[in-house]
Amino acid sequence: MNHTIRVDRNHPACFILLLDQSYSMSAPMVGAAGLSKAQALADATNRLLMQLVQRCVLDEQGPRHYFDIALIGYSDRITRLLKSGDGFGNPLVSSPQLADSFVRIHEEPDGQSWPVWVEPLADGQTMMCAALDLAYDFAAGWVASHQDSPAPVVINITDGEATDGTLDDLAERVARLVGLSTVDGPLIMFNVAVAARAAEPVLFPNDAARLADPYTAGLFHTSSVLPTRMLEYVRTEADRHGLPRPGAGARGFVCNADLAGVVRALNVGTL
């Protein structure tokens, strides 16, 4: 139960990303000139998916089945953003399926390009509780058939409060999620609070002392303590970038996240 199982074809990982697509995501993204939060989040997610596929390619045979993934968008409704296409209605998409399911190629003026799986959306309210309910259904089904795999990881990225429940309702749903486990350990929960305005990001804290409001503190308390391998990676990256080193008990939580903070959280959560 120490989160030490390594990913391979016999032990695939499970990643479930929850993306806030409410109206407030139309506001500008801190640290991403000219981009809305919705566009910046879509770009970061698409780049992450591309990197995950690339990590699964070791030879000319194409991506190996190293992970299963689901993307859940939430606003006035809950949307499954990836389709498996396997004909069996599986809620999670395997890495080989993901490699073949992008909708278009995005090209930048400087020549950079990447596949697009997710388009930006910013409309309606913030049905975060319902998104967590669906994440539970997906994760519960996955752990039932993958007990020898690494524990699943759920990453929730939002810029506001849930409109379909209280903080207690949110905590209750996260408690159900982290109650799921494999032989590797319990499910790992990340929360990323996207910045509404320029402020010092709080990266992987071990207490809520620097958090400005009860709701943000509540998101912190519903985030998992980082397993050792994730904490070691976060500390190495902090040293490399001249950032404060997270202490013992650091959680999978980022507050006042600019674009760089979102990317760091995604990278840590999908180790």
Where in the sequence are the language-model features?
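Acidic, low-complexity intrinsically disordered regions
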Residues: 1-271
